[in-house]
Amino acid sequence: VMMIYPEGILYCQVQPSDVPEIVEETLLKGRQIKRLAYEEPTQHKALPFYHDIPFYGKQVRIALRNCGLIDPESIDEYIAHDGYAALGKVLTSMTPEDVLREMKDSGLRGRGGAGFLTGLKWEFARRSQNFPKYAICNADEGDPGAFMDRSILEGDPHSLMEGMIIAGYAMGAGQGYVYCRAEYPLAIQRLKTAIAQAHEYGLLGENILESGFSFDLKVKEGAGAFVCGEETALMNSIEGKRGEPRPRPPFPAVAGLWNKPSNFNNVKSYAMTPQIILRGAAWFKAIGPEKSPGTAIFALTGKINNTGL
C-alpha cells in the first residue's frame, strides 16, 4: 500500500516495478493511475483517494492525527501542525483546576481497558498532599497482534509527550516516565530523540516556557514480561524490583512509584489530551457514544481484507 500526500491518493498492491510510473505520472504530472487505485468491491469502481473509501470514510483521527503526515523525528513539523499549542495554552491561560475541569467535561476514558475517567484520575493525584508526584505512561503493549501504541510512539512521539506534560501540570507532578517494552527499539529511539528536541526548545526541563512549571521525562525499557503491563507490576519494574503486582489499596494515586502519588494512563489517552485542550471538551464529547466520547483505535490483524489500524 502506498499513500501519496498531500493529495491523499492511495495505491494498492504496489510493486517495485510500478515506482517509475508513479513518479512520472502522479508525482511529476499529477495524474492518477487507476489500475493501482482501490476498487470498490460491489460496483467495481476505482477510488483513488483514501477518504472516498467507505472503510476510511467515517474514521476520525485524533490520537493518530499526525501519523504518516509528519516526520516523527522533527519537532518543527510537529509544531507546524499545532504541536505544543495546547501546552502553551495551558501554561499561559489555564490553572491546573481549569485543565482538570476540561478533561472531566470531555468524558475521556482510559483506552487501556478499564475505561476509568481520565480527568478524575488526575484529580485524585492532584488532591494528594504527598510529594513528589509522577506521571507515568504505560506503553507496555503486550497483547498479541496489537500495535496501536507502537504506531503513535513511532509516528508521533511529541503528541504523547505533550499530553504527559499537561497531565503533570494538572496533577502537580514534576517527573514523568514512559515505560516501553524493549521489543519496540524504534519507538524508544524516537522517544529519546523527541525528548532531546523538547529540551532544546525549552518544552521540557526547568521553567517551561518561562511559566515557573518544571517537568521532565525519562524512558524506561521493559524486559518483555507480560505482567508488567499491570500498573503496580510496572512500578516495581521502574524501581528495579521484580515485576510483580502489588496489593491494592493503597492505589497508585495515593502511594504509587516509590510510594508517592502517581498517575497512570496509556499512550492513546495522553496523545488525545492536547487536542481536547486545544479544541475544547464539547468538540471531543460530540464524537462517539455519549457514555464514552471520542475515538478508539483498533488493531486489525489475521485473515481479513483490511489489516492495520
Residues covered by each model-derived region:
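Feature of Fe-S/electron-transfer and energy-metabolism proteins
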Residues: V1-L309
